[in-house]
């Protein structure tokens, strides 16, 4: 029995290490693509900017499965932007997830107008803001269509474009989007 348990533990640890290595490789590829776009695209906010992207080390503890609760009643919400204006969204759904031992429920919005009309928008604030990350929060690109669950990977969180270029107007997350912990994952401010 002891040998069987030891073999099971060794197998689990080996597979966990392999999964982590595979995940890290995929995340690094994602970051390289993002860096390539932001450093080379003519539509990039980093064009003519000295800003360099900086990331936290990959951390699989910040990759979670979130349950989706779509709203039965559609409301609109207005978020302030980095340029002092405001932008309207549909208060579309909530994501329920667990990080460590804490449970969180954060809203997902849908763009109501503009070039992103109909796209989902997930933003958050956390305890790293004003320290190692942008004070106005970070974003994660998500998509789902009639799904009940979604992978929410904070390692793919990024700074809004207004961090790199003041000409961009970026929605600022509301207090409903606050995660009461440090999310040391994804993009951070470069030093």
Where are these regions (language model features)?
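Hydrophobic membrane-insertion alpha-helices, especially the h-region
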Residues: 1-12
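Ser/Thr/Pro/Gly-rich low-complexity linker/stalk segments immediately outside membranes or between
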Residues: 15-29
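Extended, aromatic/histidine-rich regions of cofactor-dependent oxidoreductases associated
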Residues: 21, 159-191
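N-terminal secretory signal peptides
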Residues: 33-87, 91
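Solvent-exposed coil/turn segments that connect beta secondary-structure elements
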Residues: 69, 100, 125-127, 155-157, ...
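Mid-length scaffold segments of soluble, non-membrane domains
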Residues: 74-136
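Acidic, glycine-rich flexible loop segments
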Residues: 122-158
């Amino acid at each position: 029995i002891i040998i069987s348990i030891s073999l099971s533990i060794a197998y689990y640890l080996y597979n966990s290490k392999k999964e982590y290595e595979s995940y890290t490789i995929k995340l690094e590829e994602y970051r390289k693509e993002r860096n390539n776009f932001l450093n080379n695209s003519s539509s990039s906010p980093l064009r003519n900017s000295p800003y360099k992207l900086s990331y936290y080390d990959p951390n699989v503890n910040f990759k979670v499965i979130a349950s989706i609760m779509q709203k039965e009643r559609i409301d609109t919400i207005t978020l302030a932007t980095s340029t002092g204006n405001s932008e309207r969204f549909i208060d579309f759904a909530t994501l329920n997830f667990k990080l460590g031992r804490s449970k969180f429920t954060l809203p997902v919005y849908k763009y109501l107008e503009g070039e992103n009309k109909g796209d989902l928008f997930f933003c958050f604030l956390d305890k790293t803001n004003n320290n190692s990350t942008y004070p106005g929060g970070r974003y994660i690109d998500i998509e789902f269509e009639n799904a009940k669950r979604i992978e929410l990977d904070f390692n793919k969180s990024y700074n809004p474009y207004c961090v790199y270029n003041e000409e961009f107007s970026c929605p600022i997350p509301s207090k409903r989007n606050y995660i009461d912990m440090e999310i040391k994952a994804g993009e951070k401010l470069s030093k």
